[in-house]
Amino acid sequence: MADDKKQLLIVTGMSGAGKTVVAHDLEDMGYFVVDNLPPTLLGSFWDYNSNDFHKVAVVIDLRVKTFYTDLLDEVNSLEDNGNVQATILFLDASDDVLVARYKETRRLPPLANNGKGRLLDGIQEERRILMPIKNRSNYIINTSNLSTKDLKQKLINTFSDRKRQPFSIEVMSFGFKYGMPIDADIVMDVRFLPNPFYIPELRPFTGLDKRVFDYVMNKKETQVFYQKLLDLLETAIPGYIKEGKEKLTIAIGCTGGQHRSVSIAQQLARDLSKKYPVDITHREVSRYIRK
């Protein structure tokens, strides 16, 4: 979507096709979202609010049978304003999928004749009324076979000005006695490994010191554990990426966050950086730097 014009995205379509889900996704993408705006108020809303937000999305659904003429009139009027790019996104789904969704939620479509008519009749009448809007739409997304994750990615690919952020990893060392990091996705406890704390000449230093690092990493039990950890992560990380994860935080903890966790985190960051962007944080190291 053009960057030199303010962006107005109009989200409409079949009831039950996912407008509420899309509204939440657009908010995550930085849009200011207004739900259930009557079509006749679209122009007035834009006049009063266009200067406050660069990206605006309005969700409009079927309320009256003049819906499509009102909406098209408002869109045509807005397009006469050279400072706005009005885009219509139409959400659709097959009749059988919509019927199944309505039965699951125990709700009725707007044109179901107050519950007296057949569910499918209401859906088909709504589809007929919305056809002019569908034909006028810039984008049509059929959600019949889309998971919520797939739908969000399709929205990002189509409407986000940042697209999808590249996947990255943060490796963090920490000390359990200072509390676990609350933002970690994976936490590994390495307190079972040999502890340099009990080696007097190593005690004052951290895992950033080569002597401490070599002591920890050259132990057989460390090498066995580390290889299994690396194998696990190399198996799991592609799955996180597939699920849409943009940043994965891996926390390695020992008692004080000074020796073992720092050493393991250093090696892990080094190995993972061969495939992925990696940042490393040693949460407790500043506690042990001699001043």
From Swiss-Prot:
It holds the Pfam family RapZ-like_N. GO terms for molecular function: ATP binding; GTP binding. ATP binds at residues 13-20. Disulfide bonds: none annotated. Signal peptide: none annotated. GTP binds at residues 61-64. InterPro entries: P-loop_NTPase, RapZ-like, RapZ-like_N, RapZ_C. PANTHER family: RNASE ADAPTER PROTEIN RAPZ (PTHR30448:SF0). Displays ATPase and GTPase activities. This is Nucleotide-binding protein lhv_0732. The lineage of its organism: Bacteria, Bacillati, Bacillota, Bacilli, Lactobacillales.
